[in-house]
Amino acid sequence: MNWTRGKTLGRGSTATVSAATCHESGETLAVKSAEFHRSEFLQREAKILSSLNSPYVIGYRGCEITREPFHNNGEATTYSLLMEYAPYGTLTDVATKNGGFIDEARVVKYTRQILLGLEYIHNSKGIAHCDIKGSNVLVGENGEAKIADFGCAKWVEPEITEPVRGTPAFMAPEAARGERQGKESDIWAVGCTVIEMVTGSQPWIGADFTDPVSVLYRVGYLGELPELPCSLTEQAKDFLGKCLKKEATERWTASQLLNHPFLVNKEPELVTGLVTNSPTSVTDQMFWRSVEEEVSEDRSSWWECHEDERIGVLSWIGHVVVESTWDLDGEDWITVRRN
């Protein structure tokens, strides 16, 4: 594919995101690029995304290795992932442009479409996304929700020891403990994302939840649950109850949730006329600020650690300071390793 890179829209610690135009079709693309020697996770994301084909997953358009200027480092060998352009930004953007939250009718629509995307990657591809949240779900040209940012995703079969990755506020109890992370963890994150859409806020709020350590400990070891918004209908609360089961094996699957009364026969017409600033898409700076480097720990002693030490690892212990306030769209996902 021949394409021309446009304006730089955002930078993370390893990647730069630009708009681009395909010469042959004139299609606007989103291009995520990293220096080749630092592109391991971008290549992993490209490998996973290239295997997917669903209207509820952001579209893969290709990948390339080129020699070009990169940041202020002069000319460098660059790895680029080309993706579909989504004109209405993220669900977080949609909430912001609509007064800070999304009405329940559209929450139903978006939730159903997220689950259709998860049903596809879970059942047909054996993939867990591992970082479902509002800022990782885009709104496409026809108003449909599309799962994006597969940087934390992994294959769940066969079960291979993998780092636990994701955003602390959306982590399931088993992931918060650093034990495992699979399809069930995505379902927990769907519940948290519904709360985020309805309230316009992270699923954990209040003076007791001002840092990731507190939330990880209380979710992983004290068994606490996010508070359900009182404005929700009983059906919505029941739906969230099926997502936010403490035991992973008790959570409903994506397929089961698609048949829950909260979602059945309630999808409204596709949203049109959304207010947007150009360019607003998968290339938005808000979306791409979450591009980070993996933080790794030696796996050999993980299970020998006391639970307090394991929470320390989960809170970026060692060389990253945990801020006192949350930034859901910033540098707030973590990596831990286990045997």
From Swiss-Prot:
Catalytic activity: L-seryl-[protein] + ATP = O-phospho-L-seryl-[protein] + ADP + H(+); L-threonyl-[protein] + ATP = O-phospho-L-threonyl-[protein] + ADP + H(+)
Effect of K32R: In KN; loss of kinase activity but enhanced growth associated with larger leaves, higher weight, increased chlorophyll contents and increased seed numbers. Delayed leaves senescence
Phenotype when changing K32M: Strongly reduced kinase activity and altered subcellular localization outside the nucleus
Pfam families in alphabetical order: Pkinase (PF00069)
Swiss-Prot/TrEMBL keywords: Abscisic acid signaling pathway, ATP-binding, Kinase, Nucleotide-binding, Nucleus, Phosphoprotein, Serine/threonine-protein kinase, Transferase
Modified residue annotations for Phosphoserine: S301
Enzyme class: transferase
EC number: 2.7.11.25
Limits of the Protein kinase domain: 3-263
Molecular function GO labels: ATP binding; MAP kinase kinase kinase activity; protein kinase activity; protein kinase binding; protein serine kinase activity; protein serine/threonine kinase activity
Regulation: Kinase activity is activated by abscisic acid (ABA). Inhibited by ABI1. Activated by SRK2E.
Taxonomy, superkingdom: Eukaryota
Listed PROSITE patterns: PROTEIN_KINASE_ATP, PROTEIN_KINASE_DOM, PROTEIN_KINASE_ST
Description of the deletion phenotype: More vigorous root growth, decreased abaxial stomatal index and increased stomatal aperture. Reduced induction of RD29B and RAB18 expression in response to treatment with abscisic acid (ABA). In the double mutant map3k17 map3k18, impaired MPK7 activation mediated by ABA.
Documented effect of changing T161E: Constitutively active kinase with normal accumulation in the nucleus
Binding positions for ATP per the UniProt entry: L9, G10, R11, G12, S13, T14, A15, T16, V17, K32
Description of post-translational modifications: Autophosphorylated. Unstable protein degraded by the proteasome pathway; this degradation is promoted by ABI1, but blocked by ABA.
Induction remark: Strongly induced by abscisic acid (ABA) in the flowers, leaves and root tissues. Accumulates in response to osmotic stresses (e.g. mannitol and NaCl).
GO BP field: abscisic acid-activated signaling pathway; negative regulation of stomatal opening; positive regulation of abscisic acid-activated signaling pathway; positive regulation of leaf senescence; protein autophosphorylation; regulation of stomatal complex development; response to abscisic acid; response to osmotic stress
Active site: D131 (proton acceptor)
Protein role: Component of the abscisic acid (ABA) signaling pathway that acts as ABA signal transducer in the context of abiotic stresses. Triggers MPK1, MPK2, MPK7 and MPK14 activation in a MKK3-dependent manner and MPK6 activation in a MKK3-independent manner. Mediates the ABA-dependent activation of the MKK3-MPK7 module. Positive regulator of ABA responses leading to the induction of gene expression (e.g. RD29B and RAB18) and involved in various responses including stomatal development, stomatal movement, inhibition of germination and root growth. Promotes leaf senescence.
Family statement: Belongs to the protein kinase superfamily. Ser/Thr protein kinase family.
Binding partners and assembly: Interacts with ABI1. Binds to MKK3. Associates with SRK2E within the nucleus.
Protein name as it appears in the record: Mitogen-activated protein kinase kinase kinase 18
Record organism: Arabidopsis thaliana
Gene: MAPKKK18
